Regions:
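Middle-to-C-terminal accessory/interaction subdomains
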Residues: 44-57, 66, 96, 285-372, ...
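Internal "kinase-insert"/substrate-recognition segments embedded within catalytic cores
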Residues: 155-156, 176, 197-201, 213-359, ...
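Proteolytic processing hotspots in large secreted/extracellular or virion-associated proteins
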Residues: 600-650, 655-656, 688-689
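C-terminal beta-strand-rich structural cap/linker in extracellular carbohydrate-active enzymes
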Residues: 671-692
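Sec-dependent signal peptide cleavage junction
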Residues: 20-38
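Structural signature of tandem-repeat unit edges
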Residues: 722-724, 737-759, 769-782, 792-806, ...
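Conserved oxyanion/phosphate-binding beta-strand-loop segments in alpha/beta enzyme cores
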Residues: 113-176
Length: 848
């Protein structure tokens, strides 16, 4: 959480008044809370001292090994819910709790008795307050602090046989929504970050109970820890380097004074400047401390964590700064737009990941960042001296720090990640970025900035417009809107529950404020998506922010006046449909797009009256209406679902007078667009049949296989997953476990139709005690969890498929220890990674 600066003297005075502050006759601001604390404690009935705390776990406590895990397996992910609010119950000695509350600003660690998350209970986790601005500005007597749980703080390997974790999770935090009336700002931001393939923590929402008293809803987030990278890279903790920090010195410019520590071999020799004291802790010499700057947080614990990595990090920093200055590693000038530059840069940073990070960060308009002097990011440098960027702290995303209004946020320049009025950035973008090597090494290369823009468009697809991402993943339109709608009712119910005495939501009246914020947080994601696409694709329309109030979301401002002049875009947040037109002035404009269901009377009426070309079939209809008075034709943009990915669609406009206007239709990925004379009902039509269970033009004959049903063919059960233009099935399981050999073909014939076998269901051949050989056909793309679990005699597995993308957890656990897996030679390297750590013994071989 950032340390926020006051905007005016009045705001400061009001803030202190709200917090219990008083202004003395001499103008000195005093804290009434502190004075009151000398008479009676802010929390509890007496002052709690350290000697009154319970700090020792039961000596006979046993670590529940069934709850211990490796972060790489992601077993704890299921406790961070997508469509519900998790329940977290903390049982703690009352003295420990009051001590933590009474000393909240010092963030003391206290011991809990037990913590229950969902249906799992774990003993003796550490608990502490967290934050900076939130702690400094908590209203007097309010106990709704942000919190962190540390599962292994008191249960260490030396005493208890294992350093305790929660299914692989070491620490989890609970943020109190200080700047977020919607309670969904960070939740949505992390959805976009995760979909963009950036290493991100697990997140969710949680109801917190402490000693059976309800403290309300919190944002639940995995701590910035190696567990994030272990899961992202699918590796053991031992393979992750120790340098994962939120650096104090956010610019990361190399200090040439560090050259004094370089030895003849070109390495940094810190043996005389980084030594252990009598307590076994590392200490840095004054010379090293002065030269090194803020490469890590200014605390002793972090120094101990990163000490061994410092020489590697310094070498990384020097190389980064050489490229930033336009030279190679020998100091020779280099063309920053050359292939050689990118190759050298890829030795220093994970180029693709870093570009993705900055593109997503820019899309989210999170200007409370390194470019405004804050630390809300992390840097990871691996053991080989190559770095990644990890995002952090998005409670002020979507313009709620700067530029603060919906119109300004939606149209925020895609390469601007800063407030031009803060620090020394000024209004010269290139000059400003040139002081930040971490980004400037990307910014100064044209091809990388083109990739940056492509990834920003990917963010628009994720947030609202749908389509195929650069990774090949397909996203449905309205993704963020659907994420919100899945959880909003559960969230509202949790926010409605009365809080314990002394617990109050800060800067919000819940659940009223959350409910009020919902339309605006949905709209801002759709508006920003269109604003980015408008810039990247050269549409050059200004998105109208009408109907979106960022002050309702939290910490933003309403649009006081929206000038409807020039080329403007209006957008519907639910469908992602947007329209562009020219305006000469007038009131703010907005768009509403209502999808008509095929069984509605309106749909049936239009279907019977709309005049389509011969052979065209209507598949979807959207009734459009708008506020505003444009002077030209509308250009409408219609994002379509993935089921139309391989289908050519055309647009028709059913006008208010009952006539039909055929639209000259163009296509960009999944978005169809064209000009219409007025906004009526848009009809999407196709000349081919589309796999669509609600499409009346697609019928299934009685003698055909039915999607969703299971059929048995030659002793094997198959479930039909598609029976349209494409026909696919999942192999469920054989009817008998007595077969010694099984061959999964490329296709299977069901009711006279040929279906591709594209998947093998979980547990399909589990505990088959006679199976010795299995052949996986050429169409299989996914192998489910525990497919060959405890098939103890399985010694030969032949994979013919070159399309395999996923192998489930423990798919090979318990197969013969000397088993051989044969794969296509062209896929050997990829499939070795794919089959890695699927439960098999290390003696199992994978070869071509």
């Amino acid at each position: 959480m950032r340390r926020m600066r006051g905007k005016s003297i009045l705001a400061v005075m009001l803030s202190f008044s709200m917090l219990g502050g008083v202004l003395s006759a001499g103008g000195e601001i005093k804290n009434a809370s502190a004075e009151m604390a000398t008479e009676t404690p802010e929390f509890g009935t007496q002052i709690i001292t350290e000697d009154m705390l319970n700090t020792t776990p039961d000596k006979d406590y046993k670590v529940d090994m069934s709850m211990q895990g490796d972060a790489k397996d992601g077993d704890y992910n299921k406790y961070f819910l997508d469509d519900d609010v998790q329940t977290v119950k903390i049982n703690i000695d009352e003295n420990n709790l009051m001590y933590m509350f009474q000393n909240a600003s010092d963030k003391p660690q206290v011991m809990t008795n037990q913590v229950t998350i969902g249906d799992e209970t774990i003993g003796y986790a550490g608990l502490k307050t967290k934050g900076s601005y939130t702690l400094e500005n908590m209203p007097y007597g309010n106990s709704r602090f942000s919190l962190t749980l540390n599962f292994g703080k008191y249960i260490k390997k030396k005493k208890y046989g294992a350093t305790q974790n929660f299914h692989g999770l070491s620490k989890v935090s609970f943020n109190n929504f200080y700047f977020d009336k919607s309670m969904l700002k960070e939740f949505c931001a992390w959805k976009v970050l995760s979909k963009m393939g950036i290493p991100t923590p697990q997140v969710g929402l949680a109801k917190i109970y402490i000693n059976d008293k309800y403290y309300g809803v919190y944002f639940m987030v995995e701590n910035m820890d190696s567990s994030i990278l272990e899961q992202y890279k699918k590796v053991d903790k031992s393979e992750i380097g120790d340098y994962l920090v939120k650096p104090e010195y956010y610019r990361m410019e190399y200090n040439t004074a560090m050259d004094q520590f370089i030895n003849a071999e070109g390495d940094f020799d810190l043996s005389e400047h980084l030594k252990k004291n009598e307590n076994g802790d590392y200490e840095a010499s004054e010379a090293l401390h002065n030269a090194i700057g803020g490469l890590w947080e200014y605390d002793n614990d972090t120094l101990q964590d990163v000490a061994k990595m410092i020489p590697t990090v310094l070498k990384w920093q020097k190389k980064l700064n050489q490229l930033y200055n336009g030279t190679d590693f020998s100091g020779k000038k280099i063309d920053v737009n050359s292939d050689e530059y990118v190759k050298l840069l890829d030795q220093v940073i994970d180029v693709d990941e870093v570009v993705r990070y900055y593109a997503t960060h820019s899309f989210l308009v999170q200007t409370d960042d390194m470019f405004t002097g804050e630390k809300n990011f992390a840097v990871y440098v691996d053991k080989n001296g190559k770095s990644m960027m990890l995002p952090w702290d998005y409670d002020l995303s979507m313009g709620c720090f700067y530029p603060t209004t919906a119109s300004a946020t939606a149209n925020f320049k895609i390469t601007q990640m800063y407030d031009p009025e803060r620090n020394d950035f000024g209004y010269n973008e290139e000059e400003g970025y040139s002081q930040y090597p971490l980004f400037y090494v990307i910014y100064q290369n044209k091809s990388l900035m083109n990739k940056f823009k492509k990834y920003m468009k990917d963010c628009s697809k994720i947030a609202a417009l749908g389509g195929t991402l650069s990774t090949g993943e397909t996203i449905e339109p309205g993704y963020i809107n659907s994420c919100i709608e899945k959880i909003q009712d559960k969230l509202q119910a949790a926010a409605t529950m009365p809080l314990t005495s002394g617990g109050r939501y800060i800067n919000a009246s819940q659940p009223a404020d959350m409910k009020k914020a919902l339309p605006s947080i949905k709209k801002i994601y759709a508006m920003r998506s269109v604003g980015v696409v408008s810039q990247v694709d050269g549409i050059n329309a200004t998105v109208c922010g009408s109907g979106c109030d960022l002050s309702a979301v939290g910490n933003g401002q309403p649009d006081r006046f929206i000038s409807m002049r020039g080329k403007m875009a209006i957008v519907d947040e639910k469908t992602g449909i947007f329209a562009v037109n020219t305006y000469l002035g007038g009131f703010a404009a907005s768009l509403t797009a209502t999808k008509l269901t095929q069984d509605s009377e309106q749909y049936k009426t239009i279907q019977s009256n709309v005049q389509l070309d011969a052979g065209c079939n209507a598949v979807e209809m959207y009734s459009l209406s708008a506020v505003g008075s444009p002077i030209d034709k509308y250009t409408v943009y219609v994002p379509t679902a993935s089921k139309y990915k391989n289908t050519n669609l055309v647009l028709y406009n059913y006008k208010k007078d009952g006539s039909t206007e055929k639209v000259s239709t163009k296509k960009d990925d999944n978005v169809y667009y064209g000009e219409v004379s007025e906004l009526g009902t848009l009809v999407l039509a196709t000349t081919s049949k589309v796999e669509n269970k609600t499409n009346t033009n697609t019928t299934v004959k009685k003698d055909q296989a039915v999607k969703g049903k299971t059929y048995t063919v030659k002793g094997v059960k198959y479930k039909v997953t598609a029976n349209g233009t494409k026909r696919t099935v999942t192999l469920v399981k054989p009817t008998s476990k007595n077969k010694k050999s099984i061959t999964i073909g490329k296709t299977v014939t069901i009711k006279g139709q040929s279906f591709q076998i594209t998947a093998i269901a979980a547990n399909a051949f589990a505990k088959n005690k006679k199976l010795k050989k299995a052949v996986i056909g050429a169409s299989v793309k996914t192998i489910g969890a525990k497919v060959f679990y405890q098939a103890k005699k399985l010694k030969s597995l032949v994979v013919k498929s070159k399309k395999l993308t996923k192998v489930g957890k423990n798919a090979l656990k318990g197969i013969q220890k000397k088993a051989v897996i044969k794969v296509p030679s062209s896929k050997l390297k990829k499939y070795k990674k794919l089959f890695k750590n699927k439960g098999q013994k290390k003696t199992v071989k994978i070869k071509k």
